[in-house]
């Protein structure tokens, strides 16, 4: 069943794009894992999240043809965060004559709310230009090289099912480590509550299909009954549904956990357990 659920996830994400239009305005989130990062497809909008650790971070673009270059610095709107992050755009290693200097120290940062992740930022300096082919470096730093930042590169929004899956992995980690809040806060995002709604709908659909199949092939046996669990079992399933949902939204926002939470609620609401049905077990009077 788990494999089948994973096959449904891209469709789930597509449904989220239909019901939550603000998703198409999102950058592809990335967590920077080293001091030097290669940036593929620089025109595609991406947001790199990192914290300076004593040295500058460098983002490298290798362009074989002209492209539209866009760079923007942001920092999280959290207590104690300094608005002192700057960046230098360099072409072909020409440090003496940089293309642009994004001076965050003397810039008037503006507050910015991003609905995709339901997060608040301070938006800093940006740079936009038509760039020729060549190698570009974006060097990010702060006076003490100890600040958190998000570096947005590219303006073309491209957010498909694959990127949706990546976002589900990245955003809970960003909530905890970058914005220093509980992953539960992601529920304020249309992507967050939309994921719960769609996975619950999917769980109910699977439940109805499974029940219909068992009833069709087991009309004259306990497996074919409409109800097969009593009140105590329904309460247990309700508790399981709540527990799985809380576990999911407070940790990784796993679609699988949310799906099984929805399935537990399905069993509780309709007094029917698929496992009991398969075994021919019944804990409530048959009407």
Task: Please provide the spans of the model-predicted regions.
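Beta-sandwich interaction modules
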Residues: 110-131
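N-terminal pre-first-transmembrane soluble regions of secretory-pathway and organelle membrane proteins
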Residues: 1-67
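Small-residue packing motifs within transmembrane alpha-helices
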Residues: 8-11, 16, 190, 194, ...
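Membrane-interfacial helix-loop segments of redox and metal-homeostasis proteins
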Residues: 213-287
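Mid-chain, structured segments of secreted extracytoplasmic proteins
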Residues: 69-112
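C-terminal edge strands of extracellular/lumenal beta-sandwich accessory domains
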Residues: 27-36, 59, 85-93, 127-203, ...
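Hydrophobic beta-strand segments within beta-rich accessory/binding domains
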Residues: 58-79, 136-142
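Hydrophobic membrane-targeting signal helices
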Residues: 15-23, 209-210, 265-274
């Amino acid at each position: 069943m788990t494999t089948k659920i994973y096959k449904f996830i891209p469709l789930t994400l597509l449904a989220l794009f239909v019901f939550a239009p603000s998703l198409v305005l999102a950058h592809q989130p990335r967590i920077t894992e080293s001091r030097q990062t290669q940036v593929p497809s620089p025109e595609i909008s991406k947001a790199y999240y990192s914290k300076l650790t004593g040295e500058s971070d460098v983002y490298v673009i290798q362009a074989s043809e002209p492209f539209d270059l866009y760079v923007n610095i942001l920092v999280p709107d959290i207590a104690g965060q300094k608005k002192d992050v700057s960046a230098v755009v360099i072409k072909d290693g020409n440090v003496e004559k940089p293309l642009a200097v994004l001076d965050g120290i003397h810039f008037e940062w503006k507050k910015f709310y991003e609905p995709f992740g339901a997060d608040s930022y301070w938006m800093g300096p940006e740079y936009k230009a038509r760039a020729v082919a060549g190698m570009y470096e974006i060097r990010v730093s702060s006076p003490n090289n100890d600040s958190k930042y998000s570096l947005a590169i590219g303006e073309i929004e491209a957010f498909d099912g694959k990127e949706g899956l990546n976002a589900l992995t990245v955003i809970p980690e960003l909530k905890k480590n970058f914005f220093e809040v509980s992953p539960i806060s992601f529920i304020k995002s249309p992507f967050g509550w939309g994921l719960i709604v769609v996975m619950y709908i999917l769980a109910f659909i699977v439940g109805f299909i499974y029940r219909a199949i068992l009833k069709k092939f087991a009309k004259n046996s306990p497996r074919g009954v409409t109800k097969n669990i009593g009140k105590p079992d329904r309460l247990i399933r309700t508790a399981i549904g709540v527990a799985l949902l809380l576990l999911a939204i407070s940790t990784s926002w796993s679609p699988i956990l949310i799906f099984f939470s929805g399935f537990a609620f399905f069993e509780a609401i309709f007094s029917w357990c698929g496992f009991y049905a398969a075994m021919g077990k019944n804990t409530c009077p048959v009407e």
